[in-house]
Amino acid sequence: MGFPKVERLLINYKTLDEFKKFKGCGAQELSMLEELQANIIENDSESPFYGIYYGGSLIARMSLYMKRNGGEPFEITGPYLELYKLEVLPTFQKQGFGQMLVNHAKQMQFPIKTIARIHSAGFWDKLNFTPVSVTDGDFYIWHPETNLNAVTNEESA
């Protein structure tokens, strides 16, 4: 078995079955089942889902959306990525799989916006994200131009 790597997940019923393993492992807000089902119905060929397979099973996943214009009340101008619903199955947590997913997004060299969920502030801080507070909630931002050395060869997926 080779070293696990991040890959874009196919939008199909096999992926839907894999997502069911995550149900009940985290908060309802992390559920991607409905989102995946909607993409299957719409036959959306550009999957926003990325994951890591280990031993033939999906063990970690995230949604990644390209946004065309920052325009919101934060320090992003132009295109950026929104990273949603990063989740690693409990058995595989604290082994670097979440970091692998984030580093995959960082390699695209766009600013990244994410919302810290369920006691994850330390995780985002460790990965050089900056906390931002606005009236409608808190989130974290990573800027590639100020973090050129943040993804090293050892960290990259």
From Swiss-Prot:
Protein name: Uncharacterized N-acetyltransferase BCB4264_A4022
Ranges where the N-acetyltransferase domain occurs: 9-154
Domain of life, source organism: Bacteria
InterPro entries noted in UniProt: Acyl_CoA_acyltransferase, GNAT_dom, YlbP
Lineage: Bacteria, Bacillati, Bacillota, Bacilli, Bacillales
Keyword match Amino-acid biosynthesis: no
Statement: the UniProt record of this protein carries the keyword Acyltransferase: yes
Entry's Gene Ontology molecular function annotations: acyltransferase activity, transferring groups other than amino-acyl groups
Primary enzyme class: transferase
Keywords, sorted A to Z: Acyltransferase, Transferase
EC number in record: 2.3.1.-
